[in-house]
Amino acid sequence: MWGRFLAPEASGRDSPGGARSFPAGPDYSSAWLPANESLWQATTVPSNHRNNHIRRHSIASDSGDTGIGTSCSDSVEDHSTSSGTLSFKPSQSLITLPTAHVMPSNSSASISKLRESLTPDGSKWSTSLMQTLGNHSRGEQDSSLDMKDFRPLRKWSSLSKLTAPDNCGQGGTVCREESRNGLEKIGKAKALTSQLRTIGPSCLHDSMEMLRLEDKEINKKRSSTLDCKYKFESCSKEDFRASSSTLRRQPVDMTYSALPESKPIMTSSEAFEPPKYLMLGQQAVGGVPIQPSVRTQMWLTEQLRTNPLEGRNTEDSYSLAPWQQQQIEDFRQGSETPMQVLTGSSRQSYSPGYQDFSKWESMLKIKEGLLRQKEIVIDRQKQQITHLHERIRDNELRAQHAMLGHYVNCEDSYVASLQPQYENTSLQTPFSEESVSHSQQGEFEQKLASTEKEVLQLNEFLKQRLSLFSEEKKKLEEKLKTRDRYISSLKKKCQKESEQNKEKQRRIETLEKYLADLPTLDDVQSQSLQLQILEEKNKNLQEALIDTEKKLEEIKKQCQDKETQLICQKKKEKELVTTVQSLQQKVERCLEDGIRLPMLDAKQLQNENDNLRQQNETASKIIDSQQDEIDRMILEIQSMQGKLSKEKLTTQKMMEELEKKERNVQRLTKALLENQRQTDETCSLLDQGQEPDQSRQQTVLSKRPLFDLTVIDQLFKEMSCCLFDLKALCSILNQRAQGKEPNLSLLLGIRSMNCSAEETENDHSTETLTKKLSDVCQLRRDIDELRTTISDRYAQDMGDNCITQ
């Protein structure tokens, strides 16, 4: 692999001869290392020309993969003038012909003969080399503008690693069992191709190799056409850093973050490892260049092979922005909280139904969070793949343009700057016309064939991996669909349960309202106490009323007697008045006839008159007093009549209240008796359920006497109750059908205690009686169920009516 360009150095800079050494590594071929004495001797350049021939090196990876996802660890500055041309100074003294020590090829003779026939001289090779370098330089000039990516893309191998063998380990060591000879030959073949990739301003290595042109005809005319050969000289990173301050003013500056892949570490196994870096634009299968789509698939396969997704954390695998990573962490914390709630909720003392519902909700939340997280990861990987596809295509196009355009411009500037220098110099060193020997060409062909085989193997491996990934994707999609169906079914179940719970809650509320309206035992007791108190008050009032009536009758009798006395006195008064008038007439007559009356008669008449006056006065006084008493008695009679009317009204009200309370008491007593009866029946049914089998019971009953009075009485009671309940239900159903309000006592099963039982058949055998008893119990249960359904429906209707009102 042509991995480096060697820049000319001054002889007194780092070494006397100006030759600089490189460490052996996977980016350097063993045929061009100083340990094998394969470095070409460098020429000495004056100090004033040192900053003119060095060009800025873009910071990229050593792999030569157009800078996708990788970056160089050591920044190398571009040393060039404002014109951008290179000025080479030829050797001032006799320079020996440089020799490239090449290992002997073990390839077949047919391949070497074919290469000798195809390349008889070095001129054809040099022209093809210049075209390839030009193509590379143009592509890299275009790609240099779009390679400033400040996001760190970590742990992603470069595109050139597709040429690495399949049995490479994670440390980069090769496990293929080949001989050192074959590895060195492959390294030499790759060293040739690596030189074609590293020319131009966007070279992707730690150090550069600069071309030095020397005239191949020193003793001929200096004005003749220069047929140049390429010499290589190593220049270290310190030489490029020395003039970094003067060359930061270049218009195109590409910066990349450092990657550990750009700094290879030399190990014992890597000394004989073939270089892994080969530009994808120069790979070919059967002489035909590889298409960009195939190249992209090869690169993605290598990415997945070298750095699988399971081994990467969120920072290294996705290379996201900090705000996106924060969102993912928040989402994961949010998905972990339901699990904590689920594990912690078991310690709380909730009802079992509520715990089940909370568990379902937490499980649903956790599963939805995991599904969303996986969807986010899948979408992000798809976006990364599409983004990498686009960058690969763009960078390949730019690399091709740079390769086409860059080297032609550099070659023109080199020739223009070297021609006056060669005219002024007197001593020039002849160089051989042959650039690459036939053995090297055979090695290159062998390397090309091996790379083609590797490319085919990688294509097959890529197809297999793609098929596996498609199958895994289908499986994941099926799993997601099944999970979605499961989640939808769970949601439907939750909705049904919630609806059922709501219906039950409504039913409970209506029943609670209905039961709240019914009186309780305390209310019944308080009402009974009030009833007793009111009854006592009523008795007292009735007694008082009787006494007052008796007194009234006595007073009436007294009034009648007094009225009769008054009538008699009025009659007497009239008689007295008449007597007085008669006496006055007599007096007048006597006065007229006074002369004739004697004196004794006059005195007697005067005495009688005085007596009569006194009697009249006393009688008038008695009459006035009796009249006053009569008026007073009339007033008392009127007041007593008002009191009697009021007492009658109060007694009527009390009687009505007493009647209502008596009805309530009767209804409550009936309800209590019915409840007691029902509890007795349930206890009896439970006792019957706890008894042994029916056959044993029949055998026991057969041993009893035929006429078991207790069973007959119980049967009669049950049949009478069922008959009463059936009648009540029929009446309730008729009332509901007619649109009337049902009787609550019948609806609740409250009945009076004086319910007579009907007579039954004369067959009183124990077996028939037990069968009838079981049938009656079943009928009883059916009636209870019918009553509950009707009462629930009525309560629901009442609740709906209350809600609407």
Swiss-Prot record:
Pfam families attached to this UniProt entry: CC4_CEP85
Biased composition (Polar residues): 60-74
Keyword rRNA-binding (UniProt): no
Taxonomy of the source species: Eukaryota, Metazoa, Chordata, Craniata, Vertebrata
Annotated keywords: Chromosomal rearrangement, Coiled coil, Cytoplasm, Cytoskeleton, Disease variant, Lissencephaly, Phosphoprotein
Localization of this protein: Cytoplasm, Cytoskeleton, Microtubule organizing center, Centrosome
Recorded GO CC terms: centrosome; cytoplasm; pericentriolar material
Site-annotated residues for Breakpoint for translocation to form the CEP85L-PDGFRB fusion protein: E674, N675
GO biological process terms held by the UniProt record: neuron migration
Record disease entry: A chromosomal aberration involving CEP85L is found in a patient with T-lymphoblastic lymphoma (T-ALL) and an associated myeloproliferative neoplasm (MPN) with eosinophilia. Translocation t(5;6)(q33-34;q23) with PDGFRB. The translocation fuses the 5'-end of CEP85L (isoform 4) to the 3'-end of PDGFRB.
UniProt family annotation: Belongs to the CEP85 family.
Stretches assigned to coiled coil: 439-682
Effect of S345F: In a breast cancer sample; somatic mutation
Expressing tissues: Isoform 1 and isoform 4 are expressed in spleen, lymph, thymus, tonsil and peripheral blood leukocytes, with isoform 1 expressed at higher levels. Isoform 4 is detected in K-562 leukemia cells and in the blood of precursor T lymphoblastic lymphoma (T-ALL) patients.
Function: Plays an essential role in neuronal cell migration.
Full protein name: Centrosomal protein of 85 kDa-like
Region (Disordered): 1-27, 50-89
Modified sites of kind Phosphoserine: S15, S207
